[in-house]
């Protein structure tokens, strides 16, 4: 039996899809699609908030000079180091994350108990990935050909597992392999 219930799951999927669509469109209005290489959604372990961020080649090139060579592959994919994201754009753009999605997560959090937390967490994560996937399917493939999509978990021991799992669900196999090997590759 579902912890969240079908209504909350569908509402979360629809709003995540809408949020990704609107924010990615905004990113593409500011940056050339060939310049954008990463777009991520990030959430905390307790599923209490969801944010977004996108990175560009030129931003990474500027950022990486501030780090030793061995750290550069990590900052390339670390969303706080990304070019643009939640809180850095007009409120109208972030509104779906700050209002609609936040309200859904607030309501969903009232359903958590000690006995159902892992199932609750899995349902939230799966719904986010499903909404993300719906959005990507509706974006012009020419504009996403260089972009790797993934979900990250903030300050969690499971971050890399979620990032790899979501990248596999959201990208072509080639893009997934590139992402999976991101820390072994040259910056």
What annotation goes with each model-predicted range?
Residues 45, 67-71, 169, 176:
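Intrinsically disordered, low-complexity regions enriched in Ser/Pro/Gly/Gln/His and often acidic
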Residues 60-121, 125:
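Polybasic, proline/glycine-rich intrinsically disordered low-complexity segments
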Residues 2-36:
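Short N-terminal edge-element motif at the start of the domain
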Residues 26, 30-68:
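N-terminal interaction modules that seed assembly of large macromolecular complexes
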Residues 125-133:
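Extended, Lys/Arg-enriched charged tracts that mediate electrostatic binding to polyanionic substrates
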Residues 41, 46-57, 77-84, 145-161:
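Generic preference for hydrophobic/aromatic residues in regular secondary structure cores
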Residues 134-187:
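Glycine-rich, aromatic-bearing surface loops/beta-hairpins
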Residues 23-34, 108-111, 135, 139-142:
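Short secondary-structure junctions and interdomain/linker hinges
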């Amino acid at each position: 039996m579902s912890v969240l219930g079908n209504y909350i799951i569908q509402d979360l999927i629809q709003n995540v899809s809408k949020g990704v669509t609107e924010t990615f469109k905004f990113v593409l209005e500011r940056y050339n699609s060939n310049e954008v290489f990463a777009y991520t959604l990030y959430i905390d372990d307790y599923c209490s908030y969801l944010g977004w961020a996108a990175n560009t080649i030129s931003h990474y090139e500027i950022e990486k000079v501030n780090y030793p060579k061995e750290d550069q592959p990590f900052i390339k994919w670390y969303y706080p180091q990304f070019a643009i994201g939640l809180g850095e754009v007009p409120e109208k753009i972030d509104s779906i994350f700050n209002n609609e999605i936040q309200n859904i997560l607030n309501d969903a959090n009232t359903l958590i108990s000690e006995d159902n937390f892992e199932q609750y967490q899995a349902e939230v994560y799966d719904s986010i990935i499903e909404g993300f996937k719906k959005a990507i399917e509706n974006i012009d493939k020419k504009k996403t050909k260089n972009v790797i999509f993934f979900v990250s978990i903030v300050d969690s021991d499971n971050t890399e597992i979620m990032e790899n799992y979501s990248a596999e669900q959201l990208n072509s196999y080639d893009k997934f392999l590139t992402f999976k090997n991101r820390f072994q590759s040259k910056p």
